[in-house]
Swiss-Prot record:
Quaternary state and interactors: Monomer.
Binding residue positions for AMP: 32, 37, 58-60, 86-89, 93, 162, 173
Domain of life: Bacteria
Catalytic reaction annotation: AMP + ATP = 2 ADP
Higher taxonomy: Bacteria, Bacillati, Bacillota, Bacilli, Lactobacillales
Taxonomic source organism: Lactobacillus acidophilus (strain ATCC 700396 / NCK56 / N2 / NCFM)
Protein name: Adenylate kinase
Amino acid sequence: MINLILLGLPGAGKGTASERIVDKYHLTHISTGDMFREAMANKTKVGLEAKSYIDKGNLVPDEVTARLVEERLSQPDIKEGYILDGFPRTTVQAELLEGITKRLKKPLTNVIALEVDEDTLIKRLSARYMCKNCGATYNKISKQPKVEGTCDRCGSHEFYQREDDKPEVVKNRLEVNEKMNAPLKDFYQKKGLLTIINGEQTPEKVFEDIDAVLSNNQ
């Protein structure tokens, strides 16, 4: 079984790598953003608690997020393993996750960090745009829709660029994320779980390197 966290700054290629990992290894992709939306829509106890913070414009406390993650990891669809997206973001959350995975007997097997030079990230992020309807992500450099002007996922013709993907905002965003990412990498390095992959390579080569690491777990 493979239980995985994929680390990397915005623009490092985590989304593309995640899709390929899920396709090959049939892991359950767990996104904290999706979990919050689902739990709030279903009005679960944790979902309503999270909503009370979000509605006031406050950050959801780590303990609430951790309960949501534990609830999701307890579901029966996680048979062949999971890939966590958006959690943990801090070492405090990493410690909470460690407790959860021990209780559920679903320990992490791998933490993979995609390393990309800051200049490359700025270039990639500034070229990123999204479908207004479904949120599918595209890139003017590396990932255009199959049919120009038409979203591959939903067929919409409306696209936009997020405010925080605009060049003037990107640099500051990367610095903030790196401050959060660096301690996490240290945390998992000490646990012997971390593998660093060169994210400057083509998506195919990045996945080839990830695949070489994960195939050792089977």
